């Protein structure tokens, strides 16, 4: 599943094409991509067609478009928008008109930029159909103004409003394993299996260490490493292990060549030379160094 860096790469890639552009046509080509919408395709089309995109936002693994033309305003910007979740394999691709059809295209929109007199298409491609688009209303919360469907999603590590020490204190109150806490999107969002393993390796913390056994200083250091790892991944276009994650131009990221723990089982630890091991963890796997990452 795309994690924070991959979704942020998509957001940044969409911005020069979509920001300030008007959505002139919408075609829904697979019902699962709009499964959360009671009014179906008609509701999605009505909420998007003729609207201008004024901002592209993100929290954790969620994207959203803020749209003009709905009259009411909330939190200082238009009240209505579009929420996007990429699921396991979702892609937001910028295409010229009359591009060859993709077998897993689920939604097609036509976008017009009046300033550049450009017309192109934005496709939602999703092989496994776990992703979705949905109209949304923005609401004010204690953690900022966000789409109503994701008010329970916490700030992420790249959110400029995140207070790292406050988050460290919150995490320390949890008795669960530290990796399980990092994966809880209601505590801190955007972290999945890849970046949890990488930030724990960087901070020399065993993934099954109870969060309450770590000091605020250790947890703050862990979160700082997480920020560094994610920024490094952003610089390299995210992590791609197959063709399911690509940027808006269909290009894969290459952070996978910089991974120290995730997927490195049997390989020498880049820090101490011991073999990285893989263990089952909560219906997935953890990758860590048994020498560098001791249980606290």
Swiss-Prot record:
Any coiled-coil regions, as ranges: none
Catalysed reactions, semicolon-separated: Hydrolysis of DNA containing ring-opened 7-methylguanine residues, releasing 2,6-diamino-4-hydroxy-5-(N-methyl)formamidopyrimidine; 2'-deoxyribonucleotide-(2'-deoxyribose 5'-phosphate)-2'-deoxyribonucleotide-DNA = a 3'-end 2'-deoxyribonucleotide-(2,3-dehydro-2,3-deoxyribose 5'-phosphate)-DNA + a 5'-end 5'-phospho-2'-deoxyribonucleoside-DNA + H(+)
GO MF terms held by the record: 8-oxo-7,8-dihydroguanine DNA N-glycosylase activity; class I DNA-(apurinic or apyrimidinic site) endonuclease activity; damaged DNA binding; zinc ion binding
Key words, A-Z: DNA damage, DNA repair, DNA-binding, Glycosidase, Hydrolase, Lyase, Metal-binding, Multifunctional enzyme, Zinc, Zinc-finger
Chain intervals annotated as zinc finger (FPG-type): 260-294
Record-linked CDD domains: EcFpg-like_N (cd08966)
GO biological process, one term: base-excision repair
InterPro entries attached to this UniProt entry: DNA_glyclase/AP_lyase_DNA-bd (IPR015886), DNA_glyclase_Znf_dom_DNA_BS (IPR015887), Formamido-pyr_DNA_Glyclase (IPR020629), FPG_cat (IPR012319), MutM-like_N-ter (IPR035937), Ribosomal_uS13-like_H2TH (IPR010979), Znf_DNA_glyclase/AP_lyase (IPR000214), Znf_FPG/IleRS (IPR010663)
Residues at which DNA binds: 104, 128, 174
Source taxon at top rank: Bacteria
Active site residues per record: 2-3, 61, 284
Cofactor(s) demanded: Zn(2+)
Gene3D superfamilies recorded: 1.10.8.50, MutM-like, N-terminal (3.20.190.10)
UniProt cofactor note: Binds 1 zinc ion per subunit.
Disulfide links within the chain: none
Family to which this protein belongs: Belongs to the FPG family.
Family annotation (NCBIfam families): fpg, PRK01103.1
Physiological role: Involved in base excision repair of DNA damaged by oxidation or by mutagenic agents. Acts as a DNA glycosylase that recognizes and removes damaged bases. Has a preference for oxidized purines, such as 7,8-dihydro-8-oxoguanine (8-oxoG). Has AP (apurinic/apyrimidinic) lyase activity and introduces nicks in the DNA strand. Cleaves the DNA backbone by beta-delta elimination to generate a single-strand break at the site of the removed base with both 3'- and 5'-phosphates.
Protein name (record): Formamidopyrimidine-DNA glycosylase
């Amino acid at each position: 599943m795309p994690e924070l860096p991959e979704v942020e790469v998509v957001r940044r890639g969409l911005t020069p094409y979509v920001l300030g552009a008007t959505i002139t046509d919408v075609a829904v080509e697979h019902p699962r991509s709009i499964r959360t919408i009671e009014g179906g395709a008609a509701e999605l089309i009505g909420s998007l067609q003729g609207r201008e995109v004024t901002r592209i936002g993100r929290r954790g693994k969620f994207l959203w478009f803020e749209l003009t033309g709905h009259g009411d305003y909330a939190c200082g910007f238009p009240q209505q928008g579009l929420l996007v979740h990429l699921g396991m394999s979702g892609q937001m691709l910028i295409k010229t008109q009359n591009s060859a059809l993709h077998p897993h295209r689920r939604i097609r929109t036509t976008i017009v930029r009046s300033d550049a007199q450009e017309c192109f298409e934005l496709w939602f491609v999703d092989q496994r159909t776990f992703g979705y688009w949905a109209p949304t209303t923005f609401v004010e919360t204690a953690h900022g103004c966000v789409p109503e469907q994701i008010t329970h999603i916490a700030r992420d590590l790249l959110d400029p409003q995140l207070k790292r020490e406050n988050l460290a204190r919150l995490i320390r109150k949890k008795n669960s394993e530290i990796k399980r806490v990092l994966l809880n999107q209601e505590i801190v969002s955007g972290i999945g299996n890849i970046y949890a393993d990488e930030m724990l390796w960087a901070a020399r913390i065993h993934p099954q260490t109870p969060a309450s056994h770590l000091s605020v200083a250790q947890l703050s250091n862990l979160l700082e490493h997480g920020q560094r790892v994610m920024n490094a991944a952003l610089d390299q276009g995210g992590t791609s292990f197959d063709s399911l994650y690509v940027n808006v131009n269909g290009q894969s990221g290459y952070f996978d060549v910089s991974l120290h723990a995730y997927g490195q089982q049997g390989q020498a630890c880049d820090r101490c030379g011991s073999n990285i091991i893989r263990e089952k963890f909560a219906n997935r796997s953890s990758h860590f160094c048994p020498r560098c990452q001791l249980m606290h």
